[in-house]
Amino acid sequence: MASELDGLPVIATRREEAEGFLQGLVSKSLGWARKYSLFTYPFVTACCGMEYMTMASARYDSDRFGAAMPRFSPRQADLLMVVGTVNCKQAPILQRVYEQMADPKWVMAFGVCASSGGFYDNYATVQGIDRVIPVDVYVPGCPPRPEQVLDGIMLLQKKIQNQSHKLIDRTPLPVISGGAGR
């Protein structure tokens, strides 16, 4: 494995190649594990909530896609499902919920109202939640069918699996001796 650094060839050692291989393997394993363990937090505001409940029922079984039970706190979730219309008074609340989620986090806009404001084109409605928070997957429909939502979850799973998952550096910090005890 050779690369260029200021015009001079740099040859990686076998150890560096092995570390790169292991990091890639661990990153792929993390992607595989994360894609099947989505902890959802629903932000339900409108009529699409009925289809959200249908999608979570036994007939469609969202558990087999790794998006089982909704969490009761955004701190426990990594997938925010914005279901329905968001008005201007709710936008700061939605922003706060998004900020409370732990990294990595993903957002799904559930329905036309969450994606683009729907047919509510007035001063009080946010014309798409992407004006407030970043969105990873848009699920169209008024309301979207449960099959469409499951397709959106599978699309998000592919995106999660293909992302690079950084490892946390756990090198110990140096111990500073001295102080009051000396």
UniProtKB/Swiss-Prot annotation:
Cofactor(s) required for function per UniProt: [4Fe-4S] cluster
Record's subcellular location: Cell inner membrane
Mode of membrane association: Peripheral membrane protein
Keywords assigned by UniProt, alphabetized: 4Fe-4S, Cell inner membrane, Cell membrane, Iron, Iron-sulfur, Membrane, Metal-binding, NAD, Quinone, Translocase, Transport, Ubiquinone
Binding, [4Fe-4S] cluster: C47, C48, C113, C142
GO cellular component: plasma membrane; respiratory chain complex I
GO BP term (any one): electron transport coupled proton transport
Keyword Ion transport: no
EC numbers, comma separated: 7.1.1.-
Co-factor: note: Binds 1 [4Fe-4S] cluster.
GO-annotated molecular function: 4 iron, 4 sulfur cluster binding; iron ion binding; NADH dehydrogenase (ubiquinone) activity; NADH:ubiquinone reductase (non-electrogenic) activity; quinone binding
Catalytic activity: a quinone + NADH + 5 H(+)(in) = a quinol + NAD(+) + 4 H(+)(out)
Chief subcellular location: membrane
Record Gene3D superfamilies: 3.40.50.12280
Function summary: NDH-1 shuttles electrons from NADH, via FMN and iron-sulfur (Fe-S) centers, to quinones in the respiratory chain. The immediate electron acceptor for the enzyme in this species is believed to be ubiquinone. Couples the redox reaction to proton translocation (for every two electrons transferred, four hydrogen ions are translocated across the cytoplasmic membrane), and thus conserves the redox energy in a proton gradient.
The family this protein is said to belong to: Belongs to the complex I 20 kDa subunit family.
PANTHER family noted in UniProt: NADH DEHYDROGENASE (PTHR11995), NADH DEHYDROGENASE [UBIQUINONE] IRON-SULFUR PROTEIN 7, MITOCHONDRIAL (PTHR11995:SF14)
Name of this chain's protein: NADH-quinone oxidoreductase subunit B
Species whose genome carries this gene: Anaeromyxobacter dehalogenans (strain 2CP-1 / ATCC BAA-258)
